[in-house]
């Protein structure tokens, strides 16, 4: 185990050296926030796990992700102000994929899309490993802002309307003039339709880029933003895959998790937080 850990750390160190050379600047420092092993090699032969094997040479290919030190310092400061401390640091797509795509599925060419508030995080699996990570700066908040502007409500009210529109046929709200309103969920879906198309188009383009300029076989979608009406259908259309092969993942991948609260709704919103835990 010690040799494997050292091998991985050497890989991260090499990745950091490559990054520094590409940046051509010593002013910005970076912090590794996560890495995933693509493939191990035993005497130049690919192997899933090196542990317990004897050999004269070991090698690894891995993906390492770095953030500027200032960003990481900001994250730590926010946690400390809340009276907490950081136990571990990871990436949302790494956390989500450990729950949503078990290792037995990673032989398949699958994309995982975590549609959060400010970003849509993407990871790709193929031939038994995670081959790429990516991100686009567009997600649920863009839809919330669209609802806020259209119905003249504040951001929090618009976010509530967005969430409720995925669960019920009508949504009640009060605009900034204090007028009570009721709107059909289908009308909200129509209001954000162009934004949904824009986001899914960007996600599809990033998936194709990460996957070697070709589409994937299937897509799992997690996170709150992906629950909006039409999201999975639009993404399937832009990727050129059957609509049934782009789907939200929630309770299907959380069956082995025991929840203390029996009344908790088990859906795609919980996948990433549980992966982080």
Stretches with model-predicted labels:
Residues 103-132, 147:
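Gly/Thr-rich phosphate-binding beta-strand-loop-beta motif of the actin/hexokinase/Hsp70
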């Amino acid at each position: 185990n010690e040799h494997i850990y050292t091998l991985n750390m050497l890989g991260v160190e090499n990745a950091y050296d490559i990054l520094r050379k590409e940046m051509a600047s010593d002013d910005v420092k970076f912090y590794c926030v996560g890495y995933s092993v693509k493939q191990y090699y035993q005497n130049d032969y690919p192997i899933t796990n090196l542990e317990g094997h004897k050999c004269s040479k070991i090698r690894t290919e891995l993906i390492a992700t770095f953030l500027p030190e200032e960003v990481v310092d900001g994250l730590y400061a926010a946690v400390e102000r809340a009276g907490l401390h950081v136990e571990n640091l990871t990436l949302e797509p790494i956390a989500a994929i450990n729950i949503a795509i078990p290792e037995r599925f990673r032989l398949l060419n699958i994309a995982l899309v975590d549609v959060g508030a400010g970003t849509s995080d993407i990871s790709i699996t193929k031939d038994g490993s995670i081959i790429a990570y990516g991100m686009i700066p567009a997600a649920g908040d863009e839809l919330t802002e669209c609802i806020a502007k259209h119905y003249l409500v504040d951001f929090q009210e618009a976010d509530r309307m967005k969430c409720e529109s995925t669960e019920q046929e009508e949504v009640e709200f009060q605009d900034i003039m204090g007028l009570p309103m009721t709107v059909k969920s289908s009308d909200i879906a129509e209001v954000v339709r162009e934004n949904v198309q824009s986001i899914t188009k960007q996600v599809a383009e990033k998936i194709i880029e990460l996957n070697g300029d070709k589409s994937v076989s299937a897509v799992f979608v997690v996170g709150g933003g992906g629950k909006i009406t039409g999201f999975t259908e639009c993404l399937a259309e832009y990727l050129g895959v059957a609509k049934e092969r782009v789907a939200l993942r929630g309770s299907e991948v959380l069956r082995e998790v025991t929840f203390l609260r029996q009344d908790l709704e088990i859906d795609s919103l919980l996948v990433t937080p549980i992966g982080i835990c």
